[in-house]
């Protein structure tokens, strides 16, 4: 019995999954996408930055720009023997599940974007505005030479970006049930508290940084940073790593190091969080220093052309009302939003992302393709 033919989206998704593009590698994924886009009239601009492959593609000459953004890199597989199916050999099982690293995050979305645009440009060759793609192989890694760097080049040349759909797996149970219309900011820090090393039997000759820091860390953890707002939950503070000691049981350590992170709403600022943290540490009389690292500022896309167009497309294709959300971690949307762009994240169900045996319902990618296509119709059809 002959296996049923795959849809164009599933064919492309399988081709992309079969390429072992563990971050920051691309393994030819972008070339495959670029060839397809060039065939329907896109101008392709590869951007090789350090060890990262990126490309910018655009079709049209004037009017508002709808950009599709995403990444071809995937996270490492973990132990291969733990996978039921080789991670870079796409397979659709008897239950209709598409297996492979990147099926959900986010090669499935990339395939849906390309096929949706191929259909739209064939049906509407003289569409309004412009369609663009911003694709990187540096999202799952440090993310220094990917979308962030490409956005800076676009900013320097004055490239407008009105609307952007990022293909992150936003859905929770059914495709389109949730879209991300913003993300919290992420501010990390490494706190060093200095004491005086000594013998545990002679504490009066030492200063134990663990004892000194504990009340301050407890106060930081209990602090009410803000109330959040209608779009964001309250800002959170979490300690992720705590290190002190030499490994010996009879030595008071000389220093303590605590790694922490703020996920912050638009009700707080970087400067405000830093100042309040410093005030608490100073109140406890600590000898301290912090190495701060800002991963991204919070951004929010309020109801408007893009969010309305996406919600209308989801309703038209699935009959469902979508729920906008700002929950979850950071994404490359934080870089694109700095251009003043309306940004929405819309992709497959995220239940197995970054896991062994990553998989999604294969038919969901055809639904996603239809949603992307209908969004193009809603925003750019003449």
Curated annotation (Swiss-Prot):
Binding note for cofactor: Binds 2 Zn(2+) or Co(2+) ions per subunit.
InterPro entries assigned: ArgE/DapE_CS, Bact_exopeptidase_dim_dom, DapE_proteobac, Peptidase_M20, Peptidase_M20_dimer, Peptidase_M20A
Catalytic function, reaction form: N-succinyl-(2S,6S)-2,6-diaminopimelate + H2O = (2S,6S)-2,6-diaminopimelate + succinate
Keyword Nucleus recorded: no
Cofactor annotation: Zn(2+); Co(2+)
EC number: 3.5.1.18
Binding site for Zn(2+) 2: 105, 140, 354
A GO term for molecular function: cobalt ion binding
BP GO terms, sorted: diaminopimelate biosynthetic process; L-arginine biosynthetic process; lysine biosynthetic process via diaminopimelate
Active site (catalytic residues): 73, 139
Keyword presence, Amino-acid biosynthesis: yes
Pathway entry: Amino-acid biosynthesis; L-lysine biosynthesis via DAP pathway; LL-2,6-diaminopimelate from (S)-tetrahydrodipicolinate (succinylase route): step 3/3
Superkingdom of origin: Bacteria
NCBIfam families in the cross-refs: dapE_proteo, PRK13009.1
Family membership: Belongs to the peptidase M20A family. DapE subfamily.
Subunit structure: Homodimer.
UniProt function note: Catalyzes the hydrolysis of N-succinyl-L,L-diaminopimelic acid (SDAP), forming succinate and LL-2,6-diaminopimelate (DAP), an intermediate involved in the bacterial biosynthesis of lysine and meso-diaminopimelic acid, an essential component of bacterial cell walls.
Protein name: Succinyl-diaminopimelate desuccinylase
Origin species: Stutzerimonas stutzeri (strain A1501) (Pseudomonas stutzeri)
């Amino acid at each position: 019995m002959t296996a049923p033919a795959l849809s164009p989206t599933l064919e492309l998704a399988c081709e992309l999954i079969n390429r072992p593009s563990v971050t920051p590698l691309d393994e030819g994924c972008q070339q495959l996408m670029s060839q397809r886009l060039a065939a329907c009239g896109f101008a392709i601009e590869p951007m090789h930055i350090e060890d990262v492959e990126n490309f910018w593609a655009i079709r049209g000459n004037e009017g508002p720009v709808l950009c599709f953004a995403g990444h071809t890199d995937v996270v490492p597989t973990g132990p291969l023997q733990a996978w039921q199916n080789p991670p870079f050999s796409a397979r659709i099982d008897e239950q209709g599940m598409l297996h492979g690293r990147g099926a959900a995050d986010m090669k499935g979305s990339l395939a849906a974007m390309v096929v949706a645009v191929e259909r739209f440009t064939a049906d509407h060759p003289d569409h309004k505005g412009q369609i663009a793609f911003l694709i990187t192989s540096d999202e799952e890694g440090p993310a220094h030479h990917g979308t962030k760097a490409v956005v800076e080049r676009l900013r320097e040349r004055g490239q407008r970006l009105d609307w952007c759909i990022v293909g992150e797996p936003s859905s929770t149970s059914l495709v389109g049930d949730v879209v991300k219309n913003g993300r919290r900011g992420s501010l990390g820090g490494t706190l060093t508290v200095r004491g005086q090393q000594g013998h545990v039997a002679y504490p009066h000759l030492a200063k134990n940084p663990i004892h000194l820091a504990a009340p301050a860390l407890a106060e930081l953890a209990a602090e009410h940073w803000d109330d959040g707002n209608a779009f964001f939950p309250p800002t959170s503070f979490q300690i992720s790593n705590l290190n002190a000691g030499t490994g010996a049981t009879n030595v008071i350590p000389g220093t303590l190091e605590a790694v922490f992170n703020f996920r912050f709403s638009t009700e707080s600022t970087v400067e405000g969080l830093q100042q309040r943290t410093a005030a608490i540490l100073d109140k406890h009389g600590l000898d301290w220093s912090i190495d701060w690292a800002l991963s991204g500022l919070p951004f929010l896309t309020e109801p408007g052309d893009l969010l309305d167009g996406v919600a209308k497309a989801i309703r038209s294709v699935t009959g469902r009302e979508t729920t906008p959300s700002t929950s979850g971690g950071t994404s490359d949307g934080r870089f694109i939003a700095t251009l003043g762009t309306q940004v929405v994240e819309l992709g497959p169900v995220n239940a197995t992302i970054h896991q062994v045996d990553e998989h999604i319902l294969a038919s969901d990618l055809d639904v996603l393709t239809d949603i992307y296509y209908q969004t193009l119709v809603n925003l750019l059809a003449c």
